[in-house]
Structure formats: C-alpha cells, structure tokens
C-alpha cells in the first residue's frame, strides 16, 4: 500500500510540533470538528502536511476560490512528490448558466467554455480515489456540486489484462458505453482509434500518454503506454483500468429506466401546466424534453444531461445529489482552509442555485427534477463530514461553536511577532500618513493603506501621487489575474504604496510590507469588525519592522478586541523568542508568477489599451476591430450590455486612430 511520504527541507518549529500533536490526538480520539487557529505566517500548510502524513488517510482540502486552491495544490505537491496530489475545481473558463428572466421574457441558454486541462485534472482526481489511498485532493466549493454516482463510475471502469479473452468489438462497445468516441484522425482525451487488431485509447485522466492494446485473435496479447505525439512506447503494462470519460455515465439498462421515468414526469408536468392555463410553457417543455429524450435514446447523452441526473441515478425526488465527497472512503479527512470565508460560501451556494432554476421550471424550460441537480444544502454538507479541521487565523462563529478542540499556532518559525498597533486621531491623518510612508520608502519597504470608500481611496491615491509617492489603487473591478500582477509589482518595488478598500483577498502574502494603515478604523461594520481588522493587521506580520496604525477618534469594541488579541499573541511570541534566544527575521519568499492552471480564457488575448493602440500597425488595428466587433455582438446577445458598451468605445477609439 502506498503511504504518504512528506519531503521537506523544513522541520517543525515554534508552535508547529504542539499543534500537530494536539490535532492528531483530537482526531484519533474520534472528535469530528477541530480548529487550527494559526496566525499569518505560522506555516499552517506545513502543519497540515504533517498531520496528513501521521494519519495516513485520504484528504479533501477545500479552499474558497480557484487561485487559492491552485496555490495550496502546488505546496502539497512539493511536500508529497511521490503521492497523488490532485486539483478539483470548476472546469469552466467562462460559464453563463441557463436562466430565464420573466420580466423581459428573456431565455438565456447555457453557454460555457470548458478548460480541457482542468477537466483532465478532475478525472485524474476521481480515478485516483479508486486506485490508491495516498490521495490529497485540493478543491474549491465545486466539490459540493452534483456529480454522477461513484458506484456507477466504479462499475463502468473497463478493466483489461494481458491474456484476457475479449474480442475487438467487445472492447470497442465497452469504450463507447463509457462515453469514449472513435476518432482515427484527431486523437484527443476521451477518444480512441483503431488500426486492425490494435486499439489506442486516450484516457480522460491522461495528458500526454495513451494506452495501446494489441490483440491476437480474441485475446489481449500486449498492453503498452505510448506517447500520444510520437507513438513511442514508454512502458509495458500487464493491466489497465480505463475510467469513464464522463462523471455522468449510466449503463444501458439504467438508461432505459431513466427514459421511462423522464417520460412519466413529463406527462405529469404537462398536465399540471395545462391546468394552470400555461399552454405556451407546456408546449415549450414538451418540445425541449422530447428532443433530449431522443438524444438519450440514440446517443446515450444530451446537452444538459446533468438536469436529468436524478432519473439516471434512480434517486427519489428531493434527495441530495452525489458529489466529490461521495468518492472518498468513509475514514477520509476534510480540511477547510480559510474557514471564515469558505464556510459562509458553502452555506450560500444552494439558495442562489435554487432561485435561478425555479424560474426555468415555472416557465416550461425544465422539468421539476432539474431542481435536484444542485449543490449540497449546508445541512447535507454537515452530515457528510467524517472528521474535519477548520484552518483560519480568525475562525468564524460556526467553527468556534462546533469545534471540540481549538488548537492555537501562535509562534512563527521565523520568530516574527505580531505587529505593534497604534491608534492615532483623524485630524491631520493624511500628513501623518505621508510622513510614515516616507520613513518606509527610505528603507525600501512597502505600505498598505485601507479605506472605507471608493472616493476616499481615489482621492488619497491622487494626493499621494502628486506628493511624489509611487502609489497604485486596487479596486473591486480588477480581475484576479490583474490583482496578482499588481501585488507582484508591489513586491518587486515597481511602486511602494497600495491603496484599497478590501485588501483581505488571497495573494496578499507580502513580506516587504512593514506598515499597514487603516483609515476610518472607528467606523464599526463590514471591514472594520474584529475579524477583518485582525486579518488586515496580519498583513504587516511578515516583516521584522511590521507596524499597524489605525486612524480614528474613538476606540470601538471591535478595535479593542482586535488590538487585545494581537497584543496577547505578541506577548506570547516575544516571551517564546526570549526563552529560546530567537532573533526575528523577515520572511524570505520568492516572487512567483500566477499559476498557469488558473489562467482564464480572457487572458489568452491581451486587451487593447490606449497606450498600446498607438504602437499597432494599420493591419493589426483592422484585425483587432473585426475581433472586437464579434465580441461586442456576443456580449450584447448575452445581455452583458456594460461589456458591450466598453467594447464599442474601444472600437471607436481604434477607428479614430486609423
């Protein structure tokens, strides 16, 4: 049996050994919920890696967005290079869900652009769970969305061995049954090709290798792994398990029953709509569903097959859907990273999905069973937890209430202590801030400034720029990739001060920042509550000169609690350093580029900006105008009128420059 083997140049330091011991003791004692309260920069991921190695259990790590999941996946891959570390997030680069807007009688068809690489990683994740136990899957909240039945998925695996008696047509039929398609010309994932007695299969979970099956009569003579590009043999195999090309795969016998069940539901719903006087809706539903039924009958698949998943799996109405968690064995471990963000996100998924789908059902676009293709309700998610570790610097009320044990990780391996916090009056705050910024820039350090309003952020940025400070403003309209580029430029010293409203999102791991200034700190509410203040203050905790200045004329309860908690941690850290003769050191961290797996389709073509329009040739401008006009029409068609207007303005600018 494969075991988790942790490989690292680090050893457990500070509070890490105690945290690992206490978490393992709690888990081995049978507790379902425990929390790792680890301060920023204390090495929480390394602690979790040590817990996983000690427990030797398949582990699901849930993060609250794709970017954070990709970062965690990269870190776990470094810690466990010999084990299966997988990545499971939504495979859509672009996703426009099916929707109906009654007010304008507008039906928006589902439109999506699937990232083939991420789809491959999803298949790799589910197949790994059936092949081994040393598996860590890092997932976004996509893991609570509907998937096909794990039993069906497992039973439909095509298992082939050397010496097995199986004729060619039987193997080909088996491949077609699990959603592989024959393509002798374009050999891609999820396809197979045939040349005489040689069958080559490109499994859904592979990237650059395929499986070649050589027959002698009705017997499998040889199985080899080949390079898909060159056809070079990479290795001999005695056995190969080919997993289905779709997570929604059903045997023919079950498919026939599902079609009957869909027809029955269609008949009932048509009667109901007619009684309600909805003749148009009834006709629409009949046409759409009958078309899908024909596709299922002939091809075994249809567009939007997930909306019939309840029938295909044979689940009763209202029952919870299968999801990634069902693919794990019973003794699995769950880790919820940044739980103060992730738990509320999981809690809110069901309601948003339900309101959109109910409109589709009410107006004859979908059968009521489509409502059962949904994310888990929060209560369903709770029931699926075996044993869970919540990881956060500021655990939310849910984690605090449910955890049988809260383990603190306050001491950082670097010896860094939480920053000193000072409250200063509002009067003269801008001049005071300017003076503090100059002190930092003289030492080649960086500054974060957080405000409460967009206008104040813009005005402050303009003022500091006029005063000769190299400053940037980060607002909510900037997408993830651009945010990460701004953060990278800050770390590289291309500018010194970053102003923003919500500077709590992922990626703000900045050892160069030695000052965090919080304006309007005494305005109680969102972004000025205790948890947000502690998170914001923590941004200065990776630099040995870290300091926090709050500007406010009063000290609110949230400020007091945040300052008291930070001071409590700081005292503990200083005492530990003195006892062990540790000198704090600023975190040394490479400036990484954005992880490629999370790049979205929009990043593949650089947008034209006023700066680079002047550099284009006439031919380049003409080609770009044609491309942007297509995008503008598409945006208008999808009711994205703001985007269409932006594209129109850009086209006009390009035409003017010609």
From Swiss-Prot:
Domain remark in the UniProt entry: The beta-hairpin motif is involved in DNA binding.
Binding site for ATP: 38-45
Family the UniProt entry places it in: Belongs to the UvrB family.
Subunit organization: Forms a heterotetramer with UvrA during the search for lesions. Interacts with UvrC in an incision complex.
Localization annotation: Cytoplasm
Source organism, top-level taxon: Bacteria
Pfam families (UniProt xref): Helicase_C (PF00271), ResIII (PF04851), UVR (PF02151), UvrB (PF12344), UvrB_inter (PF17757)
InterPro entries named in the record: Helicase/UvrB_N, Helicase_ATP-bd, Helicase_C-like, P-loop_NTPase, UVR_dom, UVR_dom_sf, UvrB, UvrB_inter
Gene designation per UniProt: uvrB
Name of the molecule in the record: UvrABC system protein B
Extent of motif Beta-hairpin: 91-114
Organism: Natranaerobius thermophilus (strain ATCC BAA-1301 / DSM 18059 / JW/NM-WN-LF)
């Amino acid at each position: 049996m494969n075991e988790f083997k942790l490989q690292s140049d680090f050893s457990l330091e500070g509070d890490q050994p105690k945290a690992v011991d206490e978490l393992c003791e709690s888990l081995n004692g049978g507790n379902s919920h425990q929390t790792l309260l680890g301060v920023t920069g204390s090495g929480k991921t390394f602690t979790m890696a040590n817990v996983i190695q000690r427990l030797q259990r398949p582990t699901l790590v849930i993060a609250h967005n794709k970017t954070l999941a990709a970062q965690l996946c990269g870190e776990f891959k470094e810690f466990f290079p010999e084990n299966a570390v997988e990545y499971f997030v939504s495979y859509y680069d672009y996703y426009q869900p099916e929707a109906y807007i009654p007010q304008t009688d507008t039906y928006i068809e589902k439109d999506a652009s699937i990232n083939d690489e991420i789809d491959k990683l999803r298949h790799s994740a589910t197949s790994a769970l059936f092949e081994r136990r040393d598996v860590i899957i890092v997932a976004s909240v996509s893991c609570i969305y509907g998937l096909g039945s794990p039993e069906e998925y497992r039973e439909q695996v095509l298992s082939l061995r050397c010496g097995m008696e199986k004729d060619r047509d039987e193997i080909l039929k088996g491949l077609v049954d699990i959603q592989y398609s024959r393509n002798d010309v374009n050999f891609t994932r999820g396809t197979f090709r045939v040349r005489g007695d040689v069958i080559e299969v490109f499994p859904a979970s592979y990237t650059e290798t395929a499986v070649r099956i050589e027959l002698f009569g009705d017997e499998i003579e040889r199985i080899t792994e080949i390079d898909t590009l060159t056809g070079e043999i990479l290795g001999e195999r005695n056995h190969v398990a080919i997993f289905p090309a779709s997570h929604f795969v059903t045997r023919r016998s079950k498919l026939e029953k599902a079609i009957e069940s869909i027809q029955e539901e269609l008949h009932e719903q048509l009667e109901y709509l007619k009684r309600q006087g909805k003749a148009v809706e009834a006709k629409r539903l009949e046409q759409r569903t009958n078309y899908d039924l024909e596709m299922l009958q002939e091809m075994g698949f249809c567009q939007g097959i997930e909306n019939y998943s309840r029938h295909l799996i044979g689940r009763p109405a209202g029952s919870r859907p299968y999801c990634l968690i069902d693919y794990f064995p019973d003794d699995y471990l769950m880790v919820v990273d940044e739980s103060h963000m992730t738990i509320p996100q999981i809690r809110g998924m069901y309601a948003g999905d339900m309101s959109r789908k109910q409109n589709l059902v009410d107006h004859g676009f979908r059968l009521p069973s489509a409502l059962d293709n949904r994310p888990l309700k929060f209560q369903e998610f709770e029931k699926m937890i075996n044993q869970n570790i919540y990881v956060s610097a500021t655990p939310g009320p849910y984690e605090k209430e449910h955890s049988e044990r809260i383990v603190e990780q306050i001491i950082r391996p670097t010896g860094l202590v939480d920053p000193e916090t000072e409250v200063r009056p509002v009067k003269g705050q801008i001049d005071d801030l300017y003076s503090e910024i100059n002190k930092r820039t003289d030492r080649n350090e960086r500054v974060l400034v957080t405000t409460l309003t967009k206008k104040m952020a813009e005005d402050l940025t303009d003022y500091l720029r006029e005063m000769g400070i190299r400053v940037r403003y980060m607002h909510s309209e900037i997408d993830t990739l651009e945010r990460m580029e701004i953060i990278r430029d800050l770390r590289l010293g291309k500018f010194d001060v970053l102003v923003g409203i919500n500077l709590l999102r992922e990626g703000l791991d900045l050892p160069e920042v030695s000052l965090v200034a919080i304006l309007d700190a005494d305005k109680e509410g969102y972004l000025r509550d205790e948890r947000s203040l502690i998170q914001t203050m923590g941004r200065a905790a990776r630099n040995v000169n870290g300091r926090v200045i709050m500007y406010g004329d009063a000290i609110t309860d949230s400020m007091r609690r945040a300052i008291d908690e930070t001071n409590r941690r700081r005292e503990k850290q200083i005492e530990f350093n003195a006892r062990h003769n540790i000198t704090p050191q600023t975190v040394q961290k490479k400036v990484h580029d954005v992880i490629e797996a999370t790049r979205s389709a929009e990043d593949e073509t650089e947008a034209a900006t006023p700066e680079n329009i002047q550099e284009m040739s006439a031919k380049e401008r003409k080609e770009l105008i044609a491309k942007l006009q297509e995008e503008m029409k598409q945006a208008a068609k999808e009711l994205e009128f703001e985007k269409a207007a932006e594209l129109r303005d850009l086209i006009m600018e390009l035409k003017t420059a010609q």
